[in-house]
């Protein structure tokens, strides 16, 4: 008897396919993964045009770290992001972990955020201040809010700072007893393992603020073979889990902005009106790692407007030749004037000096917003 053609031979049953096996596995273990959840993604402005361009439009859900010296601008920038988060993300609430004991009246007024200290007052668009420096307690609150979120809220957490936290065990010890070595690093790792995926997938954001620490060298002449991304505290886990790591550099005299920039500082005749914040991007999601960003702060402003956006906008306007500075005058091109006119915005053609143009823009916020959005849409790729 001859052999049957291949197309007539019975097909051997090999069992479920790889697709069906995977499908069954996902269903059986649905409580252990996030594949069935829709990812919630957005961008929140940093408040600075230059930093928004560097971050491709702002910060996304997930963990971010702000590190650096004191008075570098870490807390102010974290609150700037929080303000924009509460304004632009639907059903949003914020939570500030006050672990260092610093949240002055002046900082609150500058931020433009409504801070509350009771659970009953914690409405959408507000920030609850949790005054606690016990690592386990802070971690459990974050974990509970993220994992038990039947209301569908979007949370932003600011931890100020990682260095102010201690373990519960260490808090019960006397001053003479030894504390747990690398206790914060261990718990940081445990915390991020528990919440990192849910934090980014479900559209929550966290900013952890850290100080910098000096390395102790037994031999100051020995070669340094230890390559470190930063000198921030909290262990390596926070470095790996973070989307963005921004290092705020110290402020020096040359970073100050004077009333008369070309003259020497004088307490009466030439006052300090602001300063430039300098940031090094230590980790990024868009290949801007190790690049430097600078943005100006204007003193005396309140309600979340301390970033001197007019200053940044003018720099970009002149850089892209939408206006030219010749002699004592700054003159806008006819093309850009016509472009704004189509948006029902009237732009004055000539201004006597950059300072007068800056004052003009401060009085015409819609024009600033138009240029800001134009540069973001063009440059923040």
Where is each model-derived feature located?
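A structural signal for short, well-ordered beta-strand segments and their strand-loop junctions
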Residues: 96, 158-159, 207-209, 247, ...
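Terminal-proximal interaction/regulatory segments of ATP-powered molecular machines
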Residues: 328-334, 338-381
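Phosphate-binding/switch region of NTP-binding enzymes
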Residues: 181-320
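Conserved inter-motif catalytic segment of the P-loop NTP-binding fold
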Residues: 69, 89-181, 185-186, 190
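Glycine-rich phosphate/pyrophosphate-binding loops
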Residues: 321-329
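The Walker A/P-loop phosphate-binding site
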Residues: 3, 7-123, 143
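Conserved, well-folded catalytic cores of nucleic-acid-processing
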Residues: 54-57, 69, 81-89, 110-114, ...
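Helical mechanochemical/support elements of P-loop NTPase systems and associated helical scaffolds
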Residues: 18, 43, 47, 62, ...
């Amino acid at each position: 008897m001859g052999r049957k053609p291949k197309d007539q031979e019975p097909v051997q049953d090999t069992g479920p396919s790889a697709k069906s096996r995977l499908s069954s596995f996902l269903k059986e273990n649905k409580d252990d993964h996030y594949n069935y959840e829709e990812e919630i993604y957005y961008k929140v402005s940093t408040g600075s045009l230059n930093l928004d361009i560097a971050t491709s439009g702002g910060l996304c859900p997930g963990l971010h770290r702000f590190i650096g010296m004191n008075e570098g601008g870490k807390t102010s920038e974290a609150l700037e992001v929080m303000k924009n988060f509460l304004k632009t993300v639907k059903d949003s609430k914020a939570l500030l972990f006050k672990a260092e004991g610093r949240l002055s009246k002046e900082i609150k007024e500058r931020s433009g955020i409504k801070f509350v200290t009771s659970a009953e007052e914690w409405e959408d668009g507000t920030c609850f201040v949790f005054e606690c420096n016990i690592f386990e307690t802070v971690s459990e609150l974050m974990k509970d809010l993220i994992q038990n979120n039947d209301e569908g809220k979007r949370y932003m957490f600011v931890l100020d700072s990682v260095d102010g936290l201690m373990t519960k065990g260490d808090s019960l010890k006397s001053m003479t007893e030894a504390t747990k070595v690398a206790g914060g690093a261990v718990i940081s790792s445990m915390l991020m393992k528990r919440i990192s995926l849910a934090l980014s997938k479900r559209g929550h954001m966290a900013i952890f603020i850290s100080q910098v620490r000096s390395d102790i060298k037994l031999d100051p002449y020995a070669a340094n073979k230890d390559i470190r991304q930063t000198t921030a505290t909290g262990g390596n886990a926070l470095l790996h889990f973070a989307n963005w790591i921004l290092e705020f550099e110290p402020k020096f005299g040359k970073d100050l902005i004077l009333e008369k920039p070309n003259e020497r500082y004088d307490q009466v005749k030439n006052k300090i009106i602001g300063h430039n914040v300098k940031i090094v991007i230590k980790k990024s999601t868009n290949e801007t790692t190790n690049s430097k960003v600078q943005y100006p702060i204007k003193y005396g402003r309140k309600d979340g407007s301390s970033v001197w956006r007019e200053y940044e906008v003018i720099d970009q306007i002149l850089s892209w030749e939408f206006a030219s500075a010749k002699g004592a005058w700054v003159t806008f091109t006819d093309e850009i004037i016509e472009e704004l006119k189509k948006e029902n915005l009237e732009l004055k053609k000539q201004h006597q000096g950059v300072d007068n143009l800056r004052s003009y823009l401060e009085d015409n916020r819609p024009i600033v917003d138009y240029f800001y959005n134009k540069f973001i849409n063009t440059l923040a790729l």
